[in-house]
């Protein structure tokens, strides 16, 4: 490398050829393929000039030929260049700058298949090491180049293989691109099954170092990075019980209490939601518990944080519908969805804490609890208003219309819909995370809080609930679980039942119930069948609430299809999971309740189903008795005994 000339001298030797593109191309090939570093350097300098002039942008074939002519080892040597007895500081800087500039341009111009090859991805480690002594302009180019490389899985794996990421970590508080590189690397690599463990190890190694690096700053960039990265990780790649969780939450708490900017509020909201989703067992207590070491006169942190989230939601709703077609709506929707997710988690944590006397580290005075209850109720009422307006703008056109009464639709590539000008042109309502999170928080609140007015308001969304339930099998988001949870709270009131039946809700959930029976008994796969069975249990609870309500005199004729469907159930010889067993028992309970409450004539028409139902009870008893959980086994056996007695009385 001692014989290498500075970049300027190499460029001068090739300038004469620039006027002849063919001669230039051949000269560059010759120089780049030479065995000596001096010629290679001259060729590289000439190549940079040609690339900067844009002469090869529209010639992918020649671009690829020149890329293949480059020696990867030579590029690595240039990237490693540093000042010594033989190389001046200026020359070493020129060498690094030249290699970085050429790699940066090629990373942009090369087609995807070439960017996946080792010839480019193998430069990741030398590029990271070159960050140590690079000036700001070169550092920025290096980071942009690495970011392009790791946007594909092959490049992401190269970052995972680097043992020392300290050059990247140490500049992360000055260059957000460094955090973007880590995010792309982890999320892309996590999609490869064989790399999940490596991703976990890398995260556990890097995040503690990042926490130290951002110490003494407001850490907004870092907190935002973790909040955006965690939800994109494959669930299996998220580290289990990480040691960095507690110090990370301490950073989040510090940001919340420091009167942050709008960017800071977005960052802590999304991080809190991401951590609660990834670590539902450990994070709620770490985030919401009272810090006894603080000022005893100060309000609990959980009160402060939840109150700030509620204020953000309430202040955002009035102008949100007008922003549906604006560029800022997706970001606002994401932030408010995260806020609702945090509030949902807090409500669950609050209920558990009040029920469990052993939870001693959560304390909130009665007056603060009452104020929080009032604020949450007010926010949920505004939430209902927004959901109503958003749905009407998107689908219904007017509150509560039965689907058959909707008119004025226009054909689009996605079916027919009302041509209302305020509906989002690109964000369908059934793909809006804010709608899902808003319904989820509302469902939890009306179930836990005895607020009849709010339940009646929620019942006014019944047309939206039923339609979204049907659309869940087609869209990217699954609304069925929060909707079923909301229905449990709504079915306490007669207005809720009338609205549900008026929108054909029974038929919609019954169709889902039949599909769940097929998936759990005919072609069961343990994981999916258990998830489906859990949803089936929720459906049964909703339907039982309707049947048992004082407003329901007798079951309708069409409801009795549940009985014939249950008699066709197949109990598998191999013991299913406990939740599937519980679901099958619940189906028997639903059927016997329908038969018990039916009128005389209807009972006679379906009395032939009783022997088949009794046979199912007998089939399930040995399976239940052999369950691993003895407590659950005894409870289900008692239910089966009750069902056997009810069916015997129906004969």
Q: Language-model segments: what does each one mean?
A:
Residues 315, 319, 345, 349, ...:
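Terminal, non-catalytic domain-edge segments
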Residues 270, 334-337, 436, 480-485, ...:
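Amphipathic alpha-helical protein-interaction segments enriched in hydrophobic
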């Amino acid at each position: 490398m001692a014989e290498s000339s500075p970049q300027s001298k190499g460029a001068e030797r090739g300038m004469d050829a620039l006027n002849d593109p063919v001669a230039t191309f051949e000269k560059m090939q010759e120089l780049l393929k030479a065995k000596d570093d001096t010629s290679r350097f001259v060729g590289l300098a000439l190549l940079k000039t040609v690339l900067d002039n844009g002469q090869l942008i529209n010639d992918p074939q020649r671009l690829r030929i020149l890329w293949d002519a480059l020696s990867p080892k030579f590029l690595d040597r240039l990237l490693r260049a540093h000042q010594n007895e033989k190389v001046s500081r200026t020359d070493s800087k020129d060498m690094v700058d030249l290699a970085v500039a050429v790699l940066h341009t090629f990373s942009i111009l090369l087609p995807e298949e070439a960017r996946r090859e080792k010839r480019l991805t193998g430069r990741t480690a030398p590029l990271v090491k070159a960050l140590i002594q690079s000036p700001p302009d070169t550092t920025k180019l290096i980071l942009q180049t690495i970011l392009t490389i790791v946007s594909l899985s092959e490049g992401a794996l190269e970052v995972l293989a680097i043992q020392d990421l300290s050059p990247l970590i140490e500049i992360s508080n000055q260059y957000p691109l460094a955090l973007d590189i880590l995010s792309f690397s982890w999320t892309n690599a996590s999609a490869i099954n064989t790399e999940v463990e490596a991703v976990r190890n890398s995260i556990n190694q890097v995040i503690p170092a990042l926490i130290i690096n951002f110490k003494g700053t407001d850490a907004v960039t870092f907190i935002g990075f973790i909040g955006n990265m965690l939800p994109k990780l494959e669930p299996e790649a998220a580290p289990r019980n990480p040691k960095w969780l507690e110090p990370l939450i301490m950073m989040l708490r510090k940001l919340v209490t420091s009167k942050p900017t709008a960017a800071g509020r977005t960052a802590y909201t999304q991080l809190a939601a991401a951590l609660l989703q990834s670590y539902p067992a450990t994070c709620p207590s770490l985030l919401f518990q009272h810090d006894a070491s603080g000022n005893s006169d100060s309000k609990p942190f959980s009160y402060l944080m939840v109150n700030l989230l509620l204020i953000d939601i309430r202040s955002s709703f009035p102008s949100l519908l007008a922003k549906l077609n604006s560029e800022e709506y997706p970001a606002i929707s994401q932030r408010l969805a995260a806020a609702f997710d945090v509030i949902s988690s807090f409500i669950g944590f609050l209920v558990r804490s009040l029920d469990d006397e052993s939870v001693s580290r959560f304390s909130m005075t009665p007056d603060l609890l009452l104020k929080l209850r009032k604020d949450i109720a007010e926010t949920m009422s505004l939430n209902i208003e927004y959901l109503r307006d958003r749905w009407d703008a998107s689908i219904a056109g007017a509150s509560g219309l039965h689907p058959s009464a909707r008119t004025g639709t226009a054909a689009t590539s996605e079916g027919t819909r009302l041509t209302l000008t305020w509906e989002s042109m690109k964000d369908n309502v059934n793909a809006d995370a804010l709608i899902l999170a808003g319904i989820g928080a509302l469902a939890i609140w009306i179930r836990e809080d005895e607020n009849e007015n709010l339940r009646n308001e929620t019942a006014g969304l019944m047309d939206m609930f039923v339609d979204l339930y049907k659309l869940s099998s087609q869209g990217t988001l699954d609304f069925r679980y929060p909707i079923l949870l909301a229905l449990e709270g709504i079915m306490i009131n007669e207005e809720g039942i009338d609205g549900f039946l008026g929108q054909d809700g029974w038929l919609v959930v019954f169709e889902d119930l039949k599909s769940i029976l097929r998936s759990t008994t005919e072609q069961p796969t343990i994981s999916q069948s258990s998830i489906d069975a859990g949803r089936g249990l929720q459906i049964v609870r909703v339907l039982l609430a309707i049947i048992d309500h004082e407003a329901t005199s007798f079951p309708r004729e069409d409801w009795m299809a549940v009985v014939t469907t249950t008699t066709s159930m197949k109990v598998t010889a191999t013991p299913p999971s406990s939740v599937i067993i519980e679901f099958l028992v619940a189906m028997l309970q639903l059927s016997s309740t329908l038969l018990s409450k039916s009128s005389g004539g209807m009972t006679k028409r379906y009395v032939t189903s009783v022997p088949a139902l009794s046979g199912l009870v007998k089939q399930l008893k040995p399976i239940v008795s052999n369950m691993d959980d003895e407590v659950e086994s005894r409870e289900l056996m008692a239910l089966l005994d009750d069902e056997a007695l009810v069916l015997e009385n129906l004969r």
